[in-house]
Amino acid sequence: MFVQVAVRNEEPAQICDKIAGIVQRAVREALGNDAARNSVHLTLGSDESKGIQPWLADEIRVAILIISGETFGAAKKRKLFGLIAEMSSLELNIAHDQIVTGIIETPRENWSNGYGERQWLQYLSYQLP
């Protein structure tokens, strides 16, 4: 599981770390310890060079993208999204409509795992009938 967090320019720097912690706790609670243990978090923070305007009350403050090699049922995803929104609201005062979370479920063969082409083919050869 790969988690990417991005925030708007005007957010304090520690927001990214706090959001990453919230996502990890929500993943553990909604999807189980294995999913939380096998996750990598990348926090982008804000990018001053892009010139993004300060956030307004009705704009997105935080965007979270979760890419998973596993498939989760609709109920688990709803629980995950709800937990992230609730924890962010309670702990960071981020309104539910100011945080967007997306999950992409893709098979493990779509992940490089740092392998070059030869290593990848060798890895896949063990899975062929």
Annotated model-derived regions:
Residues 1-129:
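Interaction-mediating elements
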